[in-house]
Amino acid sequence: MLAKDDLGEVDPSLPDQVAAYRGGYLPEERRALERSLRSGDLRAVATTNALELGIDISGLDAVLVAGWPGTRASLWQQWGRAGRTHGEALGVFIAREDPLDRYVLEHPEVLFGQPVESVVIDPANPHLLGPHLAAAAAEQPLTEDDATQWFGLTAVDLLPDLVERGFLRRRPTGWYWTRRDRATDLIDLRGGAGSPVQLVEADTGRLLGTVDAARAHSAAHDGAIYVHQGSTFRVRALDLDASVALLEPVITDYSTTATDIADYTILHTDEELPWGRGSLSRGEVEVTSRVVGYLKRRYATGEILGEEPLDLPERKLRTRAVWWTVSDEQLCDAMVTEPWDIAGAAHAAEHASIGLLPLMASCDRWDIGGVSTPLHPDTGRCTVMVYDGHAGGAGFADRAFVIAEQWLTATRDAI
């Protein structure tokens, strides 16, 4: 929106030659933008990582990546969008005020001197495995031998649950898909949990796009500002039961950023190691979070114009986590003794560690979350936790535990 205004001051024809692109747009909108980009009618596009994979776009001369995209693989894939026709192209990485971005600038060897990240996944996670078993049964009857051979020993234990929930039916020849809808629709490649929330213009009924259910509380709450192809809308109402947000067009000079609070309970500690005078652990946790308000920020300057409260329900996530504790002696040695100083230092360590983990594990910054507290009741110490943002865990926290020395050393260097 601001880019189009600036371009219009240079040449009135330029605003129509740039556009925005993201995965939440309607399919017909995305296809039209892709055609315009291929034909040259569009000279530039501001996009999320939705253009990173699966779309053959040629003729691009340059790619500017604003902010670390999450992994080395993503950065090279995005840069690789340019130069497919003429053989030469320009790839630029523009760092943000972020610990990971600064770390990459100061340690370019992590980009140019190493292979892409190791793929991390927990294939036994029932939240991931269940939909895949259903999709396999929809292709042909799934036998116990097939389930064990292709999906692992834990797969057979999930089949009765899928039967009980009405997805599969047991027959002498195996398990069958029973529903009329497609089994593959159970698999959300965008990582959301639950049905996507539809963004609808209230006065016309026009569908503007969708947002993942997991992001709806922070991106489609009442009062949220939503920008669609240069037009600005404000969320009039969010109906979580119907998975619909009603929007109205507005003219405004501010954006919105949700604020939330979070806490966690350690359900089970699988492994604990001494970590200096503290400890390093991994296990199962339950994270409770709630969006409590949002900030209004002026577009041009980032100035905070105000804060509005929200009344949204709590969300609970049972997942895998890695956490470490800091002893009182360590805090005293570092001359961090006041409660607010301890909380601030722990929060800084939490954000830095979240930012650095994608360099070591094939995850996006938004695949993981973090919580820190000066004194947690389950540990009795200052505790910093990083958890998988997917129900049941995706393997990122367990990977972090294994490479903790490399990961937390990089975090310390970034701080």
Where are these regions (language model features)?
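Extended Lys/Arg-rich polyanion-binding regions
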Residues: 88-91, 97-115, 122, 127, ...
